[in-house]
């Protein structure tokens, strides 16, 4: 099972992401966090395989959260997400979190695996 950490300050997105992860074959929800700080601490304790991190959060934002997660564990795949409507932000390699689904989650993982293959 691929263990997933979701970090987002939106309660409604955390609920939706929880449903998607639970419904996705081969994935399990390891933890959810409402702040970047909480996400970093949970990642340290739980060592997830995949972290879905919102870009825009109060406190430490998604980029800083991702940097701290990467410093803690080189084994966690980190995906930055946004719901920003402007295409320039989405085209920067950010996942449009409005499109999160079991199929999208599987594709994210498959791309991460291909990128890590030598």
Role assignments for model-derived ranges:
Residues 8, 54:
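Active-site residues of response regulator receiver
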Residues 11-31:
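Two-component/phosphorelay signaling modules centered on CheY-like receiver
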Residues 32-50:
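Acidic, metal-coordinating helix/loop segments flanking the phosphotransfer/catalytic sites
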Residues 35-38, 61-65:
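Acidic catalytic/metal-coordinating carboxylates
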Residues 44-46, 68-75, 85:
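Conserved phosphotransfer cores of two-component systems
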Residues 57:
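Receiver (REC) domain active-site loop signature in two-component systems and cognate sites
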Residues 81-82:
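Hydrophobic/aromatic residues positioned on beta-strands within the core alpha/beta folds
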Residues 91-115:
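Output/docking surface of receiver
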């Amino acid at each position: 099972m691929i263990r997933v950490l979701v970090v987002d300050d939106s309660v409604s997105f955390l609920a939706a992401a929880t449903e998607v992860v639970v419904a996705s074959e081969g994935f399990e929800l390891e933890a959810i966090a409402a702040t970047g700080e909480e996400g970093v601490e949970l990642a340290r304790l739980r060592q997830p395989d995949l972290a879905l991190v919102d870009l825009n959060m109060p406190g430490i934002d998604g980029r800083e959260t991702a940097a701290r997660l990467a410093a803690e564990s080189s084994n966690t795949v980190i995906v930055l997400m946004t719901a920003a409507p402007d295409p320039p932000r989405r085209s920067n390699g950010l996942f449009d979190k409005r499109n999160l689904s079991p199929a999208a989650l599987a594709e994210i993982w498959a791309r991460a695996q291909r990128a890590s293959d030598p």
